[in-house]
């Protein structure tokens, strides 16, 4: 190239930049998920500790706190199992009725086999049916 670097060096630099952008996406997604969860937990803990609240409201706040804790554990398990299947990174978002999983792609798009592997993991960990599971590739 004009600056004296080889085409190989340019390509690897672009690859590094793309890898950094994907890594940044996953780090940012995890941070946003945690900040959102921390905010919700703070409000729920306040509600559970409110002396003026009726018992039903306190019980509901405590149930939601337990659900958030369970979702957190399930997300971590899904992420670890997906990465154990050979994917470089992923982030899972679990709620009561659905799960979304974002996978670091290879640039070739998700294949049916990729979707099947991840769907099987999510179904096993959550008991949800495939129609409640969304799998996508980070670009």
List PLM regions with ranges.
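Bacterial N-terminal Sec-type targeting sequences
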Residues: 1-126, 130-139
């Amino acid at each position: 190239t004009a600056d004296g670097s080889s085409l190989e060096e340019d390509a690897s630099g672009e690859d590094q930049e793309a890898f950094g952008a994907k890594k940044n996406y996953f780090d940012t997604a995890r941070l946003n998920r945690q900040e959102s969860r921390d905010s919700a937990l703070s409000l729920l803990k306040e509600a559970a500790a409110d002396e003026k609240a009726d018992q039903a409201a306190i019980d509901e706040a405590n149930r939601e706190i337990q659900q958030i804790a369970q979702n957190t554990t399930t997300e971590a398990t899904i992420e670890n199992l997906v990465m154990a299947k050979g994917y470089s990174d992923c982030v899972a978002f679990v709620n009561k009725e659905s799960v979304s999983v974002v996978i670091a792609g290879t640039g070739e798009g998700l294949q049916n086999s990729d979707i099947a592997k991840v769907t099987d993991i999510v179904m096993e960990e959550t008991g949800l049916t495939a129609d409640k599971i969304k799998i996508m590739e980070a670009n």
